[in-house]
């Protein structure tokens, strides 16, 4: 079996078709003794050299989808994307596998869903792989589209994170301002109560002053009335005496 199923690639799960993993071994260089890294296949290699077009296609595929490396049991493994052309049945299987994975992972059908986005990205990568094998120019064009979409998504995520951070800062600022306004309202309410007490005290003093003034005015009016009455009486007596003195005797 030259290639793995698209559901079990090494220790990963992906919709992209990969070759069988190969073991990466290190051995000293014959000249300088420095360690060199090369790929040692676990299966016998096919006889003969690869065609230039196939080698070029594999290089393009490796540039689009770089080989994956991981370490297992102290050994380094590497896995490159498959260069086998896809059949119509492979495309149907890819669609079915995508739907199955979407259901298994319970990905959201609408809205923002990282799981759904990852699965569709894997599906798009597999489509790019299939197209690149048949036409490298078309595959590179799809690669540009994929990178543009990824760049746009990163920009949207950055903008979203910035908006969320800005909203949180504004909400925190509004909360702080709200607390400050509450403290200000409490202070103003205390000032209002103090002023109301002052006003009530001043009203009481005003009423007392008006009452004292009314009593004083009534007392003064009574005093003046008595003086006027006394003066009128005295004036009448003096007038009568004056008339008695100045009247001719008979």
UniProtKB/Swiss-Prot annotation:
Family note: Belongs to the inner dynein arm light chain family.
UniProt entry keywords in alphabetical sequence: Cell projection, Coiled coil, Cytoplasm, Dynein, Motor protein
Main location: other
Purpose of the protein: May play a dynamic role in flagellar motility.
GO annotation, biological process: cilium movement; inner dynein arm assembly
Origin: domain of life: Eukaryota
InterPro entries per the UniProt record, alphabetical: Axonemal_dynein_light_chain
Subcellular location: Cell projection, Cilium; Dynein axonemal particle
Pfam families: Ax_dynein_light
Coiled coil: 168-250
Annotated protein name in UniProt: Putative inner dynein arm light chain, axonemal
Single GO molecular function: dynein heavy chain binding
GO cellular component: axoneme; ciliary base; dynein axonemal particle; inner dynein arm
Transmembrane segments: none
């Amino acid at each position: 079996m030259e290639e793995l199923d698209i559901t079990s690639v090494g220790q990963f799960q992906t919709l992209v078709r990969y070759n069988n993993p190969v073991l990466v071994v290190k051995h000293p260089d014959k000249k300088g003794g420095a360690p060199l890294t090369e790929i040692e296949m676990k299966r016998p290699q096919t006889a003969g050299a690869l065609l230039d077009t196939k080698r070029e296609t594999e290089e393009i595929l490796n540039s689009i989808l770089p080989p994956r490396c991981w370490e297992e049991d102290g050994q380094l493994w590497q896995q490159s994307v498959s260069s086998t052309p896809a059949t119509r049945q492979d495309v149907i299987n890819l669609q079915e596998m995508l739907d199955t994975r979407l259901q298994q992972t319970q990905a959201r059908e609408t809205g923002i869903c990282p799981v759904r986005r990852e699965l569709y990205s894997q599906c798009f990568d597999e489509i790019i792989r299939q197209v690149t094998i048949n036409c490298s120019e078309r595959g590179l064009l799809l690669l540009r589209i994929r990178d543009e979409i990824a760049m746009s998504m990163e920009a949207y995520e950055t903008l979203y994170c910035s908006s969320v951070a800005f909203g949180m800062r504004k909400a925190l600022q509004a909360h702080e301002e709200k607390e400050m306004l509450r403290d200000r309202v409490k202070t103003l309410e205390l000032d209002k109560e103090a002023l109301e007490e002052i006003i009530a005290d001043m009203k009481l003093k005003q009423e007392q002053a008006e009452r004292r003034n009314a009593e004083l005015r009534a007392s003064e009016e009574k005093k003046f009335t008595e003086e006027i009455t006394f003066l009128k009486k005295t004036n009448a007596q003096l007038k009568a005496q004056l008339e008695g003195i100045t009247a001719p005797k008979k």
